[in-house]
């Protein structure tokens, strides 16, 4: 219990966004689309609870009641009701779902473009929007034996993907060898990295923090050992990071 409490304090104090022990809900949203997804999830769960409660009540009432129609074989009004009501419920669920699908695919006028390339078993990133030479680096998982106090096992990397907050970021995703998947739950990002094909996704991070993800496509023996870490910082810190990276 002490370890769980310490992990919870570390996660909340330093702004880390990753799954928590015994977590039942979704991660805190840092991207407007993720906020919409959580809201839609809550709506669907509310509808589901109402349906389950109603059906259970009808079952209990039917089994416990003494009055029943032994020879009732049809009821036009009843059939109309149980056809129309589910149809309306499905429509109410479908329209917000379609809206979210389009929002997740739309990349709005990006101010920054990053290329993420999946390898067996690490990620490489390229920043090519600047007049200087392309800023590129590889990102490997930090082995358990080299973790520092407060680091997270199987989630830490040696080089984080650094982006500015309040900025539309586009990520071009591809694979160098086999299928991979670039996924960061807190940002509602999941895009397949396919060799020979360039896919795109985007996000708009609203607050500083460190956001953890992983490859979400089985890609070989070390599939579980290629995490993704995105560090969102202020624009000034991001510019300093770019300048320091360009000088190296």
From Swiss-Prot:
Mode of membrane association: Multi-pass membrane protein
Q: Which PROSITE patterns match?
A: COX2 (PS00078), COX2_CUA (PS50857), COX2_TM (PS50999)
Keywords (A to Z) from UniProt: Copper, Electron transport, Magnesium, Membrane, Metal-binding, Mitochondrion, Mitochondrion inner membrane, Respiratory chain, Translocase, Transmembrane, Transmembrane helix, Transport
Q: Where are the transmembrane segments?
A: 44-65, 80-99
Q: Which residues lie on this side of the membrane: Mitochondrial matrix?
A: 66-79
What are the GO MF terms of this UniProt record?
copper ion binding; cytochrome-c oxidase activity
Provide Mitochondrial intermembrane-side residue ranges: 1-43, 100-248
Q: Which cofactor does it need?
A: Cu cation
Compartments it resides in = Mitochondrion inner membrane
Q: Does the keyword Mitochondrion apply?
A: yes
Enumerate the catalysed reactions.
4 Fe(II)-[cytochrome c] + O2 + 8 H(+)(in) = 4 Fe(III)-[cytochrome c] + 2 H2O + 4 H(+)(out)
What top-level class of enzyme does the UniProt entry assign? translocase
The family database entries (InterPro entries) matched by this protein are listed as: CcO_II, CcO_II-like_C, CcO_II_C, Copper_CuA, Cupredoxin, Cyt_c_oxidase_su2, Cyt_c_oxidase_su2_TM_dom, Cyt_c_oxidase_su2_TM_sf
What Enzyme Commission number(s) does the record list for this chain?
A: 7.1.1.9
Binding-site positions, Cu cation A1: 180, 215, 219, 226
Q: Which GO terms describe its biological process?
A: ATP synthesis coupled electron transport
Give the principal location in a single coarse category. Answer: mitochondrion
Positions of Cu cation A2 binding: 215, 217, 219, 223
Q: Where does Mg(2+) bind?
A: 217
Q: What are the GO cellular component annotations?
A: mitochondrial inner membrane
Q: How is the cofactor bound?
A: Binds a dinuclear copper A center per subunit.
Q: Which family does this protein fall into?
A: Belongs to the cytochrome c oxidase subunit 2 family.
Quaternary structure (record):
Component of the cytochrome c oxidase (complex IV, CIV), a multisubunit enzyme composed of a catalytic core of 3 subunits and several supernumerary subunits. The complex exists as a monomer or a dimer and forms supercomplexes (SCs) in the inner mitochondrial membrane with ubiquinol-cytochrome c oxidoreductase (cytochrome b-c1 complex, complex III, CIII).
* Primary role: Component of the cytochrome c oxidase, the last enzyme in the mitochondrial electron transport chain which drives oxidative phosphorylation. The respiratory chain contains 3 multisubunit complexes succinate dehydrogenase (complex II, CII), ubiquinol-cytochrome c oxidoreductase (cytochrome b-c1 complex, complex III, CIII) and cytochrome c oxidase (complex IV, CIV), that cooperate to transfer electrons derived from NADH and succinate to molecular oxygen, creating an electrochemical gradient over the inner membrane that drives transmembrane transport and the ATP synthase.
Q: What is this protein called?
A: Cytochrome c oxidase subunit 2
Q: Which gene encodes it?
A: COII
């Amino acid at each position: 219990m002490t370890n769980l409490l310490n992990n919870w304090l570390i996660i909340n104090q330093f702004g880390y966004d990753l799954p928590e022990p015994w977590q039942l809900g979704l991660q805190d949203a840092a991207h407007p689309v993720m906020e919409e997804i959580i809201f839609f999830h809550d709506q669907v769960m509310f509808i589901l609870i109402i349906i389950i409660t109603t059906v259970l009540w009808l079952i209990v009432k039917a089994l416990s009641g003494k009055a029943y129609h032994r020879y009732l074989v049809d009821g036009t009004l009843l059939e109309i009701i149980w056809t129309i009501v589910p149809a309306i419920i499905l429509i109410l669920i479908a329209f917000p779902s379609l809206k979210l699908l389009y929002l997740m695919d739309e990349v709005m006028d990006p101010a920054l473009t990053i290329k993420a390339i999946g390898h067996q078993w690490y990620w490489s990133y390229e920043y090519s929007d600047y007049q200087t030479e392309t800023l590129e680096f590889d990102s490997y998982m930090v082995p358990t034996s080299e973790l520092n106090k407060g680091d997270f096992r199987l989630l830490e990397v040696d080089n984080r993907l650094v982006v500015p907050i309040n900025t539309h970021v586009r990520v071009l995703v591809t694979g160098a060898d086999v299928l991979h998947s670039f996924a960061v739950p807190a940002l509602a990002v999941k895009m397949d990295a396919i060799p020979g094909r360039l896919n795109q996704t985007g996000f708009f991070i609203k607050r500083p923090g460190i956001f953890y993800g992983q490859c979400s496509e089985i890609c070989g023996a070390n599939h579980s050992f290629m995490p993704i870490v995105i560090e969102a910082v202020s624009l000034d810190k991001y510019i300093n990071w770019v300048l320091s990276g360009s000088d190296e």
